[in-house]
UniProtKB/Swiss-Prot annotation:
InterPro entries: Aldolase_TIM, GMP_reductase, GuaC_type_2, IMP_DH/GMP_Rdtase_CS, IMP_DH_GMPRt. GO terms for cellular component: cytosol; GMP reductase complex. It comes from Clostridium acetobutylicum (strain ATCC 824 / DSM 792 / JCM 1419 / IAM 19013 / LMG 5710 / NBRC 13948 / NRRL B-527 / VKM B-1787 / 2291 / W). GO terms for biological process: purine nucleotide metabolic process. This is GMP reductase. CDD domains: IMPDH (cd00381). Belongs to the IMPDH/GMPR family. GuaC type 2 subfamily. Keywords: NADP, Oxidoreductase. NCBIfam families: GMP_reduct_2 (TIGR01306), PRK05458.1 (NF003966). GO terms for molecular function: GMP reductase activity. Catalyzes the irreversible NADPH-dependent deamination of GMP to IMP. It functions in the conversion of nucleobase, nucleoside and nucleotide derivatives of G to A nucleotides, and in maintaining the intracellular balance of A and G nucleotides. The active site is at C175 (thioimidate intermediate). Its EC number is 1.7.1.7.
Length: 327
């Protein structure tokens, strides 16, 4: 493959600014039949999203994907969102009971607007079969399939009927797949995104490895329609998970979807737990992300996200921050 790089290795090159104010820049994105205020989605993890956060995001024009780790709540969640006139976006796995759940939704005439097939290694027959099953019983649902890390995987899942693919194998802050297995896109996630997006004919969701707001713009440049983020969305006032105090500072727990803390057992573990500093209200982070992305668009010389997709860039191996950290 071509040159390998990650987020910290890339600097986007500015183009002539055409706006008088960054507030003129539009950060909205279309996914499926809906438009959203930002091309970002909080990771569908237990310490990142719950029913209340999903409701807040949907009511305020943001995309969300509800996690799949409390399957008994999914039916009532879908009904509740639809009763409020909001879109329903859920996750499923590939076990036998998930097939029954999809059939149940069809029988009750409940079609979530978005269904994400959420497993660690998405380039598999089990995912292909689940895509086909959902498309048979819930043909109107927008199916996101993942996670994958190769063009072949993107093509196969699209061919099976996926409406979008999620790219990223273990680059996240609480994912240790690369350490435990030797496989993944950790350390070259941005190059993997570029590689996969060239093969894609449908939207790609970049998942994992986002450490700064600027990484969102870089993901857009290399082919992402939407960017899934875990660590930047962890630790908020509304975030699920335990809050602790240490040395006079507040922290909230954040753990991976394949960690023993989520699984409830120490078996096939590919995730870990950490505590992140308390960040305050979620809405403040969303506003900051929007403002930063508006600035990115202005530097790209346009008024919408499309401007970012065509800017030039340079590869500056591991040196662009020079030790700088904003968090």
């Amino acid at each position: 493959m071509e040159s390998v790089f990650d987020y910290e290795d890339i600097q986007l090159i500015p183009a002539k600014c055409i706006v008088r104010s960054r507030s003129e820049c539009d950060t909205s994105v279309i996914l499926g039949e809906h438009s959203f205020r930002l091309p970002v989605v909080p990771a569908n993890m237990q310490t990142i999203i719950d029913e209340n956060i999903a409701l807040f995001l949907a009511q305020n024009g943001y995309f969300y994907i509800m996690h799949r780790f409390e399957p008994e709540k999914r039916l009532s969640f879908i009904k509740n969102m639809k009763s409020k006139g909001l879109f329903a976006s859920i996750s499923v796995g590939v076990k036998r009971e998930e097939y029954d759940f999809i059939k149940q939704l069809a029988q009750e005439n409940l079609s979530p607007e978005y269904i994400t097939i959420d497993i660690a290694h998405g380039h598999s027959n089990t995912v292909i079969e689940m895509i086909q099953h959902i498309k048979k019983y819930l043909p109107k649902s927008f199916v996101i399939a993942g996670n994958v890390g190769t063009p072949e995987a993107v093509r196969e899942l699209e061919h099976a009927g996926a409406d979008a693919t999620k790219v990223g194998i273990g680059p996240g802050k609480v994912c240790i797949t690369k350490i435990k297995t030797g496989f993944g896109t950790g350390g070259w996630q941005l190059a993997a995104l570029r590689w996969c997006s060239k093969a894609a004919s449908k939207p790609i969701i970049a998942d994992g490895g986002i450490r700064t707001p600027g990484d969102i713009a870089k993901s857009i440049r290399f082919g992402a329609t939407m960017v899934m983020i875990g660590s930047l969305f962890a630790g908020h006032e509304e975030s699920p998970g335990e809050t602790i105090e240490k040395d006079g500072k507040l922290y909230k727990e954040y753990f991976g979807s394949a960690s023993e803390f989520q699984k409830g057992e120490k078996r096939n573990v590919e995730g870990k737990k950490m505590f992140v500093e308390y960040k305050g209200p979620l809405k403040d982070t969303l506003i900051e992300m929007e403002q930063d992305l508006q600035s990115s668009i202005s530097y790209a010389g346009g008024k919408s996200l499309d401007a970012i997709r065509t800017v030039d860039y340079v590869i500056v191996k591991n040196s662009i921050f020079n030790g700088d950290r904003i968090y």
